[in-house]
Amino acid sequence: MGKYNLILSEYLSFIYNSQSAVQIPIYYSSNSELESRCVEFHSKCLENSKNGLSLKKLFIEYNDVIENATLLSILSYSYDKYNAVERKLVKYARGKPLEADLTVNELDYENNKITSELFPTAEEYTDSLMDPAILTSLSSNLNAVMFWLEKHENDTAEKLKIYKRRLDLFTIVASTVNKYGVPRHNAKYRYEYDVMKDKPYYLVTWANSSIEMLMSVFSHEDYLIARELIVLSYSNRSTLAKLVSSPMSILVALVDINGTFITNEELELEFSNKYVRAIVPDQTFDELKQMLDNMRKAGLVDIPKMIQDWLTDCSIEKFPLMAKIYSWSFHVGFRKQKMLDAALDQLKTEYTEDVDDEMYREYTMLIRDEVVKMLEESVKHDDHLLQDSELARLLSMSSASNGESRQLKFGRKTIFSTKKNMHVMDDMANGRYTPGIIPLVNVDKPIPLGRRDVPGRRTRIIFILPYEYFIAQHAVVEKMLIYAKHTREYAEFYSQSNQLLSYGDVTRFLSNNAMVLYTDVSQWDSSQHNTQPFRKGIIMGLDILANMTNDARVIQTLNLYKQTQINLMDSYVQIPDGNVIKKIQYGAVASGEKQTKAANSIANLALIKTVLSRISNKYSFATKIIRVDGDDNYAVLQFNTEVTKQMVQNVSNDVRETYARMNAKVKALVSTVGIEIAKRYIAGGKIFFRAGINLLNNEKRGQSTQWDQAAVLYSNYIVNRLRGFETDREFIMTKIMQMTSVAITGSLRLFPSERVLTTNSTFKVFDSEDFIIEYGTTDDEVYIQRAFMSLSSQRSGIADEIAASTTFKNYVSKLSEQLLFSKNNIVSRGIALTEKAKLNSYAPISLEKRRAQISALLAMLQKPVTFRSSKITINDILRDIKPFFTISEAHLPIQYQKFMPTLPENVQYIIQCIGSRTYQIEDDGSKSAISRLISKYSVYKPSIEELYKVISLHENEIQLYLISLGIPKIDADTYVGSKIYSQDKYRILESYVYNLLSINYGCYQLFDFNSPDLEKLIRIPFKGKIPAVTFILHLYAKLEIINYAIKNGSWISLFCNYPKSEMIKLWKKMWNITSLRSPYTNANFFQD
C-alpha cells in the first residue's frame, strides 16, 4: 500500500539493528477466511521468535496474507539497551563543536551558558526557559535525522547535493551535542537538572530547532540560510529572529506592481493588469541599510548579502527568496524570557508630560463612540443576551485556570484544582458564588500571570483574572463581535472572509496617486499610555449606553462591565521571582480579559483614525479603506495628484511625528505598493504568508497526548508547506512513527501502520497523500473504521465520580432550569455532556482516559475485534455513491495568474485552472433560520451536530424543542409550517456535510468549489427532486476531480447515473451520519 509502511519497516531495522531484534508484522482482513490466515500467521510468528527461529519461511508460506491482507501494525522486540543514539552519533560528530559567545544577549540567562552557571543548585533550576514542550525527545529527533542520512547516502545527482548539504549541517549539530553527551529526557519528556547541569542550558531546544531547519534544506540557498541561523542561534537566543525578519517591512515597499488581483463588487478576486510603481524615498533606503548593518554586526553574512543582491533589481520573480528568509527566521525557536523581565518590559516606557492632550481626547472619544455604536441597538431593544448575560457566560465558561489552586469537594472525592469551571461549581454549592461582585485586583489581591511565547518577539504576559471578570464581560463582548462581524474595518472578524479578501481590498485602491500607511501597534497595546484613555473611553461609552434603557438587568450587565474596567485601572500583578512572589503595580493593558481582542481592535481603529484626522489638516486625500487586524492597522489614502518621493517622505515623517505626539512607540511605514503585517504581507501585488510554525519545539505544554501532538506536527507541516517552507516528508513520517508507537513493555513496542493512522477514525493522524483528505471506501478500510468506532469513547472513574456528585448535578440542573422553559432532553443532555467534557482539562481525568484509550488501542492493534458498528459514517455514504460514477479524461486550461507564489506546484495548478475563493463556506449552521430563531429568544447556541439531529425529528418534536428554549408558540408553529423549515433541512445537512469533509481546512479552503470550470466536468442527469442527494453527488464529484488533479496534475470528468430507487435510501442514510473527532480534526481545528 503505502510508502509509510515501507519507511516504517526500514526505520525499525535501523533502530533495532542488533541480533536480538525481531519485527513481527500483524495483518488483518475483512474477508473471514483470509482473516483466520492472518491470525494463524501472527501466532506462528510469535512462536518462532520465542524459539529464536527465523521468520523467513513463514513469510513465504503465508504469502497470501502479505499480498492480500492489510498491514495493521508491526510488533518489535529488542533486548539491547537503547543507547544506540550515542553510538550512532559519534559517526557524524566529526566537526568542530560550536562555542557559545556568552556576551551576545543583554539578559544573562539568555546566554547559552553551562546550566550550572545559570542555576548553581537543583532547587534554583527551572526548565521553563528552554523546555521544548513537545512529547518527543532530542534522541528521537537525532535518530530520525541519522535514519534519513543513512538511507540516502547513496543518492545521486541533485539528490546527492541535498544529502551533502544536510550531512554538513548535521555534522555541526552532532559534533556540538556529542561534545556534551545527548541529554536524556525523563518520562514526561523533560530535561532535569542532573542531566543538564554540565551542558549548555539551551542545548536541547537549539538542537531541535537546528534539526527542523536542516531537514528543511533542499537548495543551496536553503543551506546558506540554515547554516547561518543554526550557528548563530546557538549563541544568540534573544534577537536573531527579529534582526533577520525586520527588513521585510521595508522590502514589500520596493517591488513594482505589474498586474495584480483586486476584490470586485461581488467580493471575488479579479485580475487587474494595472501597473503601480514603487516610489521609495532615500530615507527608506537608509533605514534598510541600517537594518542590514545591524544584521552584519550580529555576525550574519550570507543572509544580508542575499538581500543586498536582490536590491539591485527588486524583482518579484526573485522575491520568494526574501519570503523564504523571512519564514526561516522564525524556525530558530521560541524566545522564552523570565516572567519578571516580560512584565517589566511593558513598564519601562517612561511617562512624559509632553503629550498632545487634544489627540488623547480625540482617541478616547472615538473609542467611546465606537463602543456606543456597537451596542446601542442591543441596549435599546433590551436584547435578551444582555439580560441573561450571566447564564450565557456560564454556558461558555472555559476550563482554563482561575489563577489559584483550591481544594474542592465533589461528593466523597476531594481534589485540588485551578480550573474555572470547577471553582464555579464549588462556589455555587457553598453559597460563595457572587457574580454581582467583581473582585479587586489591587495590591491586596494581585493578578497571577500566564505567558505567551513567540519566536522573534519578547515574551508577553497574560492576566489570569478571576472568573467573575469573564462572566461580567462575556455578553457585551459577544455583542461587540457580532457588530464587528459585519463591519469591513475589522478584518479579523469580518463575516466569513478569509485573508484573500483583505488582500484584494488593499490592492484594489493602489494606484499612482495613492499610498498605503501600515503600522504595527503591538507596542502601543501593551503600553502604559494606552491604559487610561483606553479604559476611560470604554467606561464613558458604557455610561452613555446605560442611559438608553430602563431595563434593570441590562443596566446591571453594563455596570458590571464598567466595574471590570474601573478595577483594572488599578491593577497589581504577582510574579514569582525565585521563591519570592513579587507584587508589582502594573499600569498597562494585558491579554486575558474576554474583551482583549475586540477592545484592542476598537482601540487600534480609533488610533489610526486619530492619526489620519491629524494628517488631513496638512494634506488633502480621501481615505479609501481603513482596516485593523489584530495588532496591525493599515489605510489606503488617495491624493489628487500623482505621488512623488518627496510626498512619501513627508507623509511618512508626519505620520511618525503624529504617533510620537501620543508617545506611541510604534513602527509606522508608508508605501505605494505593498504592506507587511503580522498575519500576511503583500509585495509586487502578490500575497505571502509567513511559514513560521515551529515543528520540534512547542510554545507550552497542554494535556494533549503523543498522538495528538503527532497530528499537530503533521498539520503544522502542511500549513508551512502551503506557505512556502517545506520540511522533508520522510522526516515528518519518521516523527509520526516515533510519536504514535506504543510501548507494551520495556523491550516490546507496537507501531501502527499507515492504514490505522490515515483512515478517518477516532485515531486518524495524517493523510497518506499531502493536501488530499481520503475517505476510504474499500472493505478493509470500512472494516477497520468500524472496529475503531467500537472503542472510541473511554470512561474515566474520576470524571464519573465528579459527574455523580450533587455539586455537579446541581450545577447542571441550575443551568438547565435557567435556560429551559419546559423539559428538553436534547439540551439538558447536551449541557451535561459539555460540562463533563470540560473536566477533561483536569490532568488526572485526561490521564485516566488516556490509559484506557491506550490499552484498548493495544488490544485492537494486535487483533481487530469483529465488531459490526451500525453507525453510518461519511465513508459509508461515499461508498454507496462511488460505483455509479464513471471517469473519462478531460482538459482544463490554465486561465488565472498566480497570486500566491509560495504555494506548492500541484495546489497552484488547481487554483490557476478553477480559481480561488475569498469566503469561508458556512459549516456551522449559523445561517439557518432555526439557528437565527433560537438566538433571537435564547442565549443557547446549539452546535451543528445538535441542529442536524433536531432538524430531522418529527415536526411536533421540533416545536417542543423550540418552545422549551423560550421561543413563543406562535413563532415555533409558523416555523414548522413554513417552507423555510424544509429549506433549513437542506441547509443544515449541507453545513453538516461540509463540516465532516473539512472543506474549510488545508488547501481545500483555497479552491473555488462553485467554479463553473469545475461544474462543467460533472454530468449528473436530473432525476426527481431530492436536493440533498444532488448536493452530495456533486460535492463528491468535485472532491474526486480536485483530488485527482492534485495527485496527477491533470483533469478528469465524471458522469453519474444514479438510480432513482437508490436516491431515497441514500437520503435516509444521510440523516444518520456520525461525526468522527480525531487527533487529526482537532489539529485542523487548532490551526484555526
Curated annotation (Swiss-Prot):
It comes from the Viruses. SUPFAM superfamilies: DNA/RNA polymerases. Its EC number is 2.7.7.48. One of its GO terms (molecular function) is RNA-directed RNA polymerase activity. It catalyses: RNA(n) + a ribonucleoside 5'-triphosphate = RNA(n+1) + diphosphate. One of its GO terms (biological process) is viral genome replication. InterPro entries: DNA/RNA_pol_sf (IPR043502), RNA-dir_pol_4-hel_dom (IPR042032), RNA-dir_pol_luteovirus (IPR001795), RNA-dir_pol_reovirus (IPR007097), Rotavirus_VP1_C (IPR022071). One of its GO terms (cellular component) is virion component. PROSITE patterns: RDRP_DSRNA_REO (PS50523). Residues 501-687 form the RdRp catalytic domain. Its cofactor is Mg(2+). Belongs to the reoviridae RNA-directed RNA polymerase family. RNA-directed RNA polymerase that is involved in both transcription and genome replication. Together with VP3 capping enzyme, forms an enzyme complex positioned near the channels situated at each of the five-fold vertices of the core. Following infection, the outermost layer of the virus is lost, leaving a double-layered particle (DLP) made up of the core and VP6 shell. VP1 then catalyzes the transcription of fully conservative plus-strand genomic RNAs that are extruded through the DLP's channels into the cytoplasm where they function as mRNAs for translation of viral proteins. This is RNA-directed RNA polymerase.
